[in-house]
Curated annotation (Swiss-Prot):
Gene Ontology molecular functions: rRNA (cytosine-2'-O-)-methyltransferase activity
Name of this chain's protein: Ribosomal RNA small subunit methyltransferase I
EC code: 2.1.1.198
Domain of life: Bacteria
Amino acid sequence: MPALKVIATPIGNIEEVSPRVKAALTKCEVLFCEDTRVTKKLLGLLGIDFSNKQFIINNEFKEKQNLSKVANLIHQYHCGLVSDAGYPSVSDPGHILVEYVRTQLPQIAIEVINGPSALVCGLVTSGFPESPLLFLGFLDHKPTQVTQTLKHYQNFQGTIVLFEAVHRLQQTLEVIQTVFSNTEVFVGRELTKLHESHYWFNTSAPLPDITLKGEFVIVINNHHTQPVGQYSDQLLKQEITQLVQMGVKVKDACHYLAKRLQLKSNKLYTLFHESD
């Protein structure tokens, strides 16, 4: 069955390329690329001969124009979709092409070739709870729109991840300070690259001295602390019961819930057994 291979590429370190990714890049005769120069450089570093490959620019301006091309090419050649770094369609071009194949070419499979993700890397490095999770990607270029977007999600109870360019980082962090009070924030710079660096700070404190160079992932820990009294006993028992019904031990369920809601595990354990 013909397939469109959606291939994740390194976000910084060339060694992030798995044998499966390399095999897919080698096999593809046609590559839809965010930037053909970047893709050719990657293939060169991997020792892949691309002299007989066809490269088609697939950036935000060209993606819709490529729909007819993929329809014609995918029945004749092995076709792949790549972005400059990470996964196509995750804050990069790609989803329009994938959606077209899914809806208009049902006889064509969509095969994702897994690899690195700045979203996952930033989230894991932050050490913040992984769920609920809200991913905003790159925000609007206009400062007023950035403020409006972040205020819209101000009351989201969870972890928020976004990407930012170096020339807008300082401005965006200042908006985050204004919108999210007394909140932990992580900034990852040049993740998996040689000069990778990490910064943690609280929005109630001054911004750290961040090297303004490279690419950035921002993670906001918007899990708000609340006094025990603000959670009803009935709701807490219900949450523990649901976890137990899923096969989780009572002690582990209480520990998990206590960590998530920033409560005392022993108090939850006592509360759960009060009616026993």
